[in-house]
Amino acid sequence: MALTTPKPGTRPTTDRTKEAIFSLLDSWGVLDDARVLDLFAGTGALGVEALSRGARELVAVESAAPAAALIAKTLTALKHNRSWEPGMSARVVKARAEKYAAAASAVAPFDVIFIDPPYAFETEACNQLLADLAGRESGELTGEGTVIVLERSTRSDEPTAPEGWDITDRRDYGETAVYY
């Protein structure tokens, strides 16, 4: 299914980067029946790809109304596709990712969290978002086995893992650095 990109300001993950991310996630076996949170969802491509590879639930968080509307349209089309299985769910939350990470609650932790902010998103803000995800107590969005996939510009300062978390890998794909 081809995804549409809202005009200005949305930088979709390149096919090469997306394939590399999902190849690694597949090798770790974390996508089967996964609950996926896609922060700064943009086109929704990462979340939709996760669903196509076995995830059962997607929450896509996007603050830009045109982008959120396009994701909703894509998810509606996907739900009418024969590949959609009973038990799968997907929804869009129109909110700022930072506010969602700091305040939202979940019935169970997410297995995979994609964080793909604009390249101009400051490293301090990125570190705060990670700290907010790590510091939650009730309605936690993360659990012990949660895999975080963070995309940044290779020119950005490296993010700092919150206490108790580790950045275990960094892979560069052109202008994009992906942290796990």
Language-model features and meaning:
Residues M1-Y180:
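Class I S-adenosyl-L-methionine-dependent methyltransferase catalytic core
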